[in-house]
């Protein structure tokens, strides 16, 4: 029968039918492994890019840290220089001979190199007769100027003191006070 079919087909002038192509279906394992390999390749490339960026950041940070370290070194050198200067100044101040500079121990605030001249009275004092006075008289005048503790000093005590009345004379008048003093005294009296 098959021979008759072949003869009919060849009589019609047709060609022999081509064999059917069988499509091969990939195995499930191959699909999974391909997906896995492709995903891992992408993941590795992504991680590589991230590591490269991280290395660049680390380099930049290291450069900044080196710069900061150089600034810190400069500041440290300045601090050490200032400290040495302070120590040397303290040594100079403690070992220098004390000659009374700046008026502390040298007398009247002058430098030790300036000689002190004795104070001479001006020519007008001799004319007034102060040089020819007796020193005892000066002491008596000083005693007169200092107030006696028994004598009252304030204006209120002056007016109430019985010692202000003379034996035969009138009452001693208090000195004229400025208006401000009178106002203060009136304020104290009202209290």
UniProtKB/Swiss-Prot annotation:
A GO CC annotation given for this chain: cytoplasm
Amino acid composition bias (Acidic residues), ranges on this chain: 135-144
Classification via Pfam families: DUF4677 (PF15726)
Signal peptide range in chain numbering: none
Region (Disordered): 101-191
Protein keywords: Coiled coil
Coiled coil regions, renumbered to chain: 39-68
Disulfide topology: none
Name recorded for this polypeptide: Coiled-coil domain-containing protein 184
Annotated source species: Mus musculus (Mouse)
